[in-house]
Structure formats: C-alpha cells, structure tokens
Swiss-Prot record:
This is L-threonine 3-dehydrogenase. One of its GO terms (cellular component) is cytoplasm. Zn(2+) 1 binds at C38, H63, E64. Catalyzes the NAD(+)-dependent oxidation of L-threonine to 2-amino-3-ketobutyrate. HAMAP family: Thr_dehydrog. It comes from Streptomyces griseus subsp. griseus (strain JCM 4626 / CBS 651.72 / NBRC 13350 / KCC S-0626 / ISP 5235). InterPro entries: ADH-like_C, ADH-like_N, ADH_Zn_CS, GroES-like_sf, L-Threonine_3-DHase, NAD(P)-bd_dom_sf, Zn_alcohol_dh. The record marks D148 as: Important for catalytic activity for the proton relay mechanism but does not participate directly in the coordination of zinc atom.
Length: 342
C-alpha cells in the first residue's frame, strides 16, 4: 500500500510502498478515505526539536482520518465491514486507575497514533476496536476526517456552561475557529476571537463570531468596549499557547471567570497569579478528547446544524502531499484535507 512515511531522521516525508498492516482479534482494519493535516504532522515533517525527541523512524504519520471498515478481528462486536468510521488517536492502556474509572483521556500511558505508532497517512490503518468511532448518522467526509481536532475544540469549548456567557477565544487557528462555532451554537451571548492573522480572522467571521479582533492593531479591552462589556469575559478559551495571549486573557476576565487552556506553550512563562487568586479565576488544562463523551457531543452538534464547512480551505490528492503540507504550514488557511481515493 501507499503511505506517507518519516523514513529518515531529517526534514521531509517520503511517499512509499509499505506492507498492509496486520490486525488482531480485537482490531479493525480501515481503508482510509480522507485525512486531515495537523500541526503535529508539520512538526514531524520539519523534524524540529520536539519531533526529534518524540518520533522514532521509520514512522507512518497521521492521526486525523475517516475511512471505511475493511475487516474486523474475530472478537470485535458492534462494528461491521463497510461502516464509515473515524478514530480516536489516543491509545490508552485500559488498566490504570483512570482507565478503569472510565476517565480514559487521563491515562498516563497514552500512545499517539501517527506519533508513537504507525498512523493513518496510508491506504489502510489498524486500530483497536475500542478506538473506532462509527458514524451512525450521515456526515460529510471532510468533516469526519477532522473529528480529532474538532473534538479538541468541543472538549475545550464545552468545559464550562456557555449559555448567555461572554466568551473570549485567543488564537484563530482551525481549532480556535471550530471552538468559536461551537460556543456560538451552544448559546454563548458574545464570542470574541483574537489573532494577528487577518486571513484566519476572516475565516472566523464566517462561523459567526461577534468580533474577530486583530491584536496587532487593537487590544482586547478595545473589543470589550465595542461590545459594551463592562465586567469582562465569563469564559476564556486559550488556543494559541502564546504567553501574551494567556496574560491578556487573565487581565480581561470577570471575577469568577473560567479559562480552558488547550494551547500548548513552547516554554514556561509568568502569569498574574495574584489576579487569578483574588479574582477567583478557574484555569483548566485540556488535552485531547473525553472518550467518548466528546465524540457523542460532536455528532449531536453536527446533527443539530453546526456548520464547520468554512474551516476546510484546501483539498489535495495524497500524491500532492508536498503542496498540501506547504499550504497547511503557511498559516493562512484552515484545515487541509488529503484524499486517499484519487
């Protein structure tokens, strides 16, 4: 089969012929239809400092995908050949305290698909049946391919009740934009998103944010005044990992405000902890998706009319992966899709 492989410990990816993966009695063999390119994949392609520590070559990368079940193991139930499926990219041990308590997203032994084991940038991928999500209702293939990052957005956005709340989102990357769409759909009063990229702020406007604010030119306080917010934001969703974004978020929260933080900082940084304490602000770290409450929520949101189409800005055949990765790395668009059927 064809696969995109990190063949060498150096920058680049290689489209190669590799053996089809074998599957065991509790596994599912999936014919990949479409995949999404993630920031993690860009790091692996560039072979930066993180990738050098995290990845062992050779490796088939990729963890955002949709596919059709090609075969199932002898012990697999409730999944059938021909089912349309996506996959949870965090593989857990199933034996630790958190896993046994049903908190699998908190497993201390999580292995990442396409990082710690061969992934989905290939014609076929194998996953444990427990990591396979069957789409029981019709879903657009491009959207099904990005259920992994969509899940990050949903997990973050729905960390706190949103109805009637004023929400600040720092970082208008694809996940930030999806989180904005979710917050709007879930009943937030005002949704403000910030970035320094006009191209991405334009995408955010397409999902119905109240204000898309370029913080290179204006401050968050300016945005508050424009919307008539006198007491600050109720909910903060930090998606950028930028120290200045987190500091500005803390400075613009109301007393008792709640912050969900998905953005991963590159290094340690200082924040105004005195303000967090005296304003009684809650800060919650978010990583991945809750298994499988987040997946259920994603499906229900889409059934209820949530429109993520503006987030998809590029589609390429898998043989054009270099152009697709360049597009994704430009930082100018949304999600980029690779089609494995052409």
């Amino acid at each position: 089969m064809k696969a995109l492989v990190k063949q060498k410990a150096e920058p680049g990816l290689w489209l190669m012929d590799v053996p089809e993966p074998e599957y065991g009695p509790t596994d599912v063999l999936i014919k990949v239809l479409r995949t999404g390119i993630c920031g993690t994949d860009l790091h692996i392609r560039a072979y930066d400092g993180w990738a050098q520590q995290a990845v062992t070559t050779p490796l088939i990368l990729g963890h955002e995908f949709v596919g059709e079940v090609a075969a199932i193991g002898s012990d697999v139930a409730d999944i059938a050949t021909g089912d349309l499926v996506s996959g949870e990219g965090h593989l857990v041990c199933g034996k630790c305290r958190n896993c046994l308590a049903g908190r699998r997203h908190l497993c201390r032994s999580t292995v990442g698909l396409g990082v710690g084991r061969d992934g989905a940038f290939a014609e076929y991928v194998v996953l444990p049946a427990s990591n396979v999500w069957v789409h029981r209702v019709p879903v657009d293939l491009d959207i099904a391919a990005i259920f992994d990052p969509f899940g990050n957005a949903v997990h973050t956005a729905l960390s706190f009740p949103l109805v009637g709340e004023d929400v600040l989102i720092t970082g208008a990357g694809p996940i930030g934009i999806m989180a904005a769409a979710v917050a709007r759909h879930a009943g937030a009063r005002n949704v403000v998103i910030t970035d320094v990229s006009e191209a991405r702020l334009a995408l955010a406007r397409k999902v119905g944010v109240s204000l898309a604010l370029n913080v290179a030119d204006r401050t968050i306080a300016d945005g508050q005044r424009e919307l008539g917010l006198r007491e600050g934001f109720d909910i903060g969703l930090e998606m950028s990992g930028r120290p200045e974004a987190m500091r500005e978020m803390v400075a613009n929260m109301t007393h008792g405000g709640r912050i969900a933080m998905l953005g991963l900082p590159a290094e340690e940084f200082a924040v105004d902890w005195a303000r967090i304490v005296t304003s009684m602000i809650t800060v919650k770290g978010i990583y991945g998706r809750e298994m499988y409450e987040t997946w259920y929520a994603m499906s229900v949101l889409l059934e209820g009319g949530l429109d993520l189409a503006p987030v998809i800005t590029g589609r390429y055949g898998y043989r054009d992966f270099e152009a697709a990765f360049d597009d994704a790395a430009s930082g100018l668009g949304g999600k980029i899709i690779l089609d494995w059927t052409v």
